[in-house]
Amino acid sequence: MTTPPFLAGERLTASALNHMYAAADASNRSVTAATMTPISSQYAIDAFDAAVGTTYRLSCWGVGAQGSSAQTLSFRANTIAGSGLNLVTIANSFCATTAQFRWFARMTTTCAATGSGGTITGFLEGLVIQTGVTRPSIQFNSEWTGSAINTATNWGIEIDCEWGSVTGTPSITCNGTLFERLG
């Protein structure tokens, strides 16, 4: 069980608050390519910011349109300075051809070891649902452990996506991104 950042009755100080923060933006980013491309905004993490147990969470959401020829859609968590983490591919049946859809993706990663031999573990999750349809959403998730990251240099995180093919002109747009550092 983890200890909460503040205990009941504890005095809240500026030095305690600097361990948790968030940043958000509403920049639109679109992906129409069949190659991994950032769909979320990219957030930098300073060298030596991560300690063992430091957790970062990146959420993004938006809309899209399936092409006139149904295509698969893949998401991937990425460490920018490191490498792409586990890839999740959604079958092309997630949405009818030419139909609109809504989507959400969240990456959560925790530092397991620091320095030039640092490692992170984490999870990528999300959902996609066709607009105006009552059928269940398509959920996706992926986990990684022991991914190498040098926490002694600047690094960062983003969520990428790609289409299986550009045939039929599919598109996906991010309408907002939220980055959080959680203690």
Each model region followed by its residue ranges:
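C-terminal trimerization/auto-chaperone modules of long, extracellular attachment fibers and adhesins
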Residues: T2-F6, R11
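Surface-exposed molecular-recognition determinants
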Residues: G9-E10, L17-G183
